[in-house]
A protein has these predicted regions:
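Generic alpha-helical structural signal
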Residues: 10-17, 44, 111
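Intrinsic disorder at enzyme termini
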Residues: 1-13
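Glycine-rich flavin
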Residues: 26-125
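N-terminal glycine-rich anion-binding loops that anchor highly charged ligand groups
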Residues: 15-24, 50-52
Length: 125
């Protein structure tokens, strides 16, 4: 079994790592590195950072604003987030509610809810 990554995968990994090293919000990085609990605003800032980088919809189809990444790219992305000591991504909107809406929702529901879930303007509590 070959479990090595392709050159494209390694380049993708480096792009993510570089983006995190250069652009990850410093106030969140400092708290994470010191083990200080993040506030709600910190978590929102982190998610908005992901959105601005084009990474918030890491597991969403392109047609709904996602990245369209492969499973290998998603794996590498999540590994790089962990390596950079990023906070966990809040799962409810992006990983639970959003996919149900884009899979089973009608067009009105998709238009109304998906953009705000992706931008973290609306989320499940």
């Amino acid at each position: 079994m070959d479990i090595s990554f392709s050159e494209q995968d390694l380049q993708f990994k480096e792009e993510i790592r570089s983006g995190l090293e250069n652009d990850f919000p410093s106030h969140i990085r400092e708290k994470q590195n010191q083990g200080i609990a993040l506030t709600k605003d910190d978590r929102i800032d982190f998610h908005k950072f992901l959105y601005e980088k084009g990474w918030a919809g890491y597991n969403w189809p392109v047609k709904y604003g996602g990245t369209g990444w492969s499973l290998v790219q998603i794996y590498l992305f999540l590994n790089e987030l962990a390596y950079a000591n990023c906070p966990t991504i809040l799962p409810f909107g992006l990983n639970m509610v959003g996919p149900v809406i884009y899979t089973y929702g009608n067009q009105h529901q998709k238009d109304k809810f998906l953009p705000d879930i992706l931008k973290f303007n609306s989320w499940c509590k």
